[in-house]
Curated annotation (Swiss-Prot):
Its biological purpose: Component of the proteasome core, a large protease complex with broad specificity involved in protein degradation.
Protein species of origin: Mycolicibacterium gilvum (strain PYR-GCK)
Gene3D superfamilies per record: Glutamine Phosphoribosylpyrophosphate, subunit 1, domain 1
Signal peptide residue numbers: none
Annotated control of activity: The formation of the proteasomal ATPase ARC-20S proteasome complex, likely via the docking of the C-termini of ARC into the intersubunit pockets in the alpha-rings, may trigger opening of the gate for substrate entry. Interconversion between the open-gate and close-gate conformations leads to a dynamic regulation of the 20S proteasome proteolysis activity.
Protein name: Proteasome subunit alpha
Gene Ontology MF terms: threonine-type endopeptidase activity
Biased composition, class Acidic residues, residue ranges: 241-251
Taxonomy, superkingdom: Bacteria
Biological process terms in GO annotation: modification-dependent protein catabolic process; proteasomal protein catabolic process
UniProt keyword terms in alphabetical order: Cytoplasm, Proteasome
Length: 251
């Protein structure tokens, strides 16, 4: 007589968590950090079409790591929700906390009820409305629907521990945009598998900001010459030397 296969709920949750964590760790890292004029997003992303960072609404931004199709579905759903709320009520009624709670509820339901959890981790950020003074808000939402309010920065994906350690040592409140980019890029470079820090150039970075000084839509991407001007000069020099000498390592 054969007995039906049984797995305890605790074991099932552990296996789901392990699956999601492994999927998230395979992705390249993303940093979101508060600076003097808003929030800076820096993602290690060589793709120009599959973006990890985007706008959700006027003063709200989004960053994610993990499976692209899964977090892109969440991003699209968040945009639709925000547009509906803003149209039905007021644009000012759409907040980062509201969207973070929606994502937390959605991911929590998927984690407990569906056959496979989403292998994603999200960050929702919000800056003050134009002319107002309020500290940026950063929310981390994990694969199981857990939500945390982070005061200064969020690190997701890849090898987060060395990156978080580097940020704890170098992060400065109310830093300028140039200093914030330098801090974030240096921290990302510390997250490689090798012992030596990596050099990351414009071709491997996706950078955007939520600028509280912009009147309505705070989100802005930084690309091309504008990004090169913000990167440390030493990094730019190293990139040119690498291109003339030995082949660069994989991104």
């Amino acid at each position: 007589m054969s007995f039906p296969y049984f797995i305890s709920p605790e074991q099932a949750m552990r296996e789901r968590s392990e699956l999601a964590r492994k999927g998230i760790a395979r992705g390249r890292s993303v940093i979101a950090l508060a600076y003097a004029d808003g929030v800076l997003f820096v993602a290690e992303n060589p793709s120009r079409s599959l973006q990890k960072v985007s706008e959700l609404y006027d003063r709200v931004g989004f960053a994610a790591v993990g499976r692209f199709n899964e977090f892109n579905n969440l991003r699209s759903g968040g945009i639709r929700f925000a547009d509906t709320q803003g149209y039905a009520y007021s644009r000012r009624d759409v907040t980062g906390r509201q969207l973070a709670n929606v994502y937390a509820q959605t991911l929590g339901t998927i984690f407990t009820e569906q056959a496979k959890p989403y292998e994603v981790e999200l960050c929702v950020a919000e800056v003050a409305h134009y002319g107002e003074t309020k500290a940026p808000e950063l929310y981390r939402i994990t694969y199981d629907g857990s939500i945390a309010d982070e005061p200064h920065f969020v690190v997701m994906g890849g090898t987060t521990e060395p990156i978080a350690t580097a940020l704890n040592e170098s992060y400065a409140e109310n830093a300028s945009l140039e200093d914030a980019v330098r801090i974030a890029v240096a921290a990302l470079g510390a997250g490689g598998n090798g012992a030596e820090p990596r050099t990351l150039g414009p071709s491997t970075l996706e950078v955007a900001i939520l600028d509280a000084n912009r009147p309505r839509r705070a989100f802005r991407r930084i690309t091309g010459a504008a990004l090169e001007a913000l990167l440390p000069q030493a990094d730019t020099k190293d990139d040119s030397q690498d291109s003339e000498g030995a082949a660069e390592p994989d991104a």
